[in-house]
Structure formats: structure tokens, C-alpha cells
Amino acid sequence: MLKSMSALAATLAISAACLTLLPGGKRAEAQSAGMFVNAVDLDIVPAEREKYLAAIKENGAAAAKEPGCRRFDILNLGSDPNHFFLYEVYDSEAAFKAHRETDHFKKYMAITGKMVAKRESRQMSVIAANAK
């Protein structure tokens, strides 16, 4: 639990700084409120790590191209090569739900089902994003 909570806290702190930036480095503080975040903590079966990485990179790249997806970050806990954290930001909960209906998401879930030893996800609404 501590590992997942510390990963969550670190990721949220790092990502909050990036959340308010639009392409070209323009700030979007007013647009950040109301956005929707999906944060996922994952422990991967060690023997499946490389296959998992290929699958999540493919899914993340496709997700980032979806209308309504602001970012899709794939992070690895440095002290544990098999512990990953996904940080996904969408314009709305509806955009997140649309993501879960895409062919690439369904493919990712089908391929990685047995690769994941533990999955814990949280959905959150952005109240405010503060960054310099």
C-alpha cells in the first residue's frame, strides 16, 4: 500500500506541473478544472515485463491520439522494475468512457490480462492544477 501511495503522490506532483500546459507551452489553468484523471497502479508478472511494456506503449500512443485525451503517461517505480503507474488525463469523464470502448483499449486488456499480478485504479476530477 505504501508503495502505491508514494507512487501516486510522486506522479500527481510531477504531472500537475505538466497538466496546465498546452502544445506550444501555453498555460491552460482555466481549462484544467473539470478534467478527468484515471490513475492506475500495476504490478506486472516479472516474466511478462517486456511483453507488457510493448502492449502498454502501443495502447498509450493510440490513446494519446484520441479526441479528449490530454495525456497518457506510463511511469515505472525506480526501485521496482515490475511496478508501473499510468496517469491518464481526459477532457471529461465521457472522454474517458469513450477511451474504454476503443479497439486498442480492448486489445490491451485482452493481451495483458494474465500479465498483471495486481491492478488498482482510481478515477478523479481535477479541481485545480497549480504550476509555475
List PLM regions with ranges.
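Glycine-rich beta-strand-turn "strand-cap" elements at beta-sheet edges
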Residues: S4-G34, I74-D80, M109-K132
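N-proximal accessory regions
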Residues: A28-V37, D41-L53, Y90-E93, I127-A129
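Residues at secondary-structure transition points
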Residues: Q31, H99-K106
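Short, well-ordered beta-strand segments in beta-rich or mixed alpha/beta enzyme
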Residues: M35-D43, D73-R100
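Short amphipathic alpha-helical segments
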Residues: E48-R70, H104-Y108
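Residue-level signal for well-ordered alpha-helical positions
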Residues: A55, L75, H99-T102, I111
